[in-house]
């Protein structure tokens, strides 16, 4: 299987599951390959044949983009190191959940969540602690008795019941056989990935740019947007330069001089914005030959400089889009 085949399989699964899909991101490097939405579920999907190809910088950007856009970041791949990814098993890379196409299919089309997670040392299952404790006490069985039956310590059984420790597959099967109940806790692949502090992320990047001689024109433009009242998250591996967010809106924000590459990126940003349900704006440092590209509004820097707050910017975007739609 090639990566191209893998991407087509993933797109097919998501489409069959009822997701609306963005165009594929064709930039390098890229933090995600496709955005997908179904109702309130938004996915930013990174495709890697070998999931070990995910690096920390890309994973970090995936997490922050997902947080800003109210979605989940996942990696879909085929192998890790020298072995193929197992079905119904999830893997973690830099706090990003990774899985294979079959697991993706089972989750979104068959409504069958994975139960097993891979970790150093083997495969593990999270236990429904309350169910285990209720079953044990229902049979008036002590911690010690149960521990001896499955070959673990009393403390380990206690940890299982407190949901403070995962168990091996063999142990879970033994426990389920003893009590005749299902104990494996389903894994929600849409869960939030770790703690995210997007504001600090944006600030830390800004701090590295505070030296006057290192500021680039696009950085100054992002500062202007920030002064309008937006929380600005700069990006390094996305089709847009930043995500700008306030209490009422989220804007995919491109910054560049006008050229043919800008038009291509504006098309891609438009597609992504339709899926993420955000605004899409390209700030042109200089003259722009066009006013908009599909849903992406082009704004010259001199026009941006005349805008005083976030609401005025939104009004400007809406007016320009309406003008484009009337043509």
Swiss-Prot record:
Signal peptide: none annotated. Residues 132-190 form the HTH cro/C1-type domain. The keyword Transcription regulation applies. It comes from Methanosarcina barkeri (strain Fusaro / DSM 804). HAMAP family: HTH_type_cro_C1 (MF_00584). InterPro entries: Arc_TR_HTH, Cro/C1-type_HTH, Lambda_DNA-bd_dom_sf. One of its GO terms (molecular function) is DNA binding. Residues 143-162 bind DNA. This is Putative HTH-type transcriptional regulatory protein Mbar_A2318. Pfam families: HTH_3 (PF01381). Keywords: DNA-binding, Transcription, Transcription regulation.
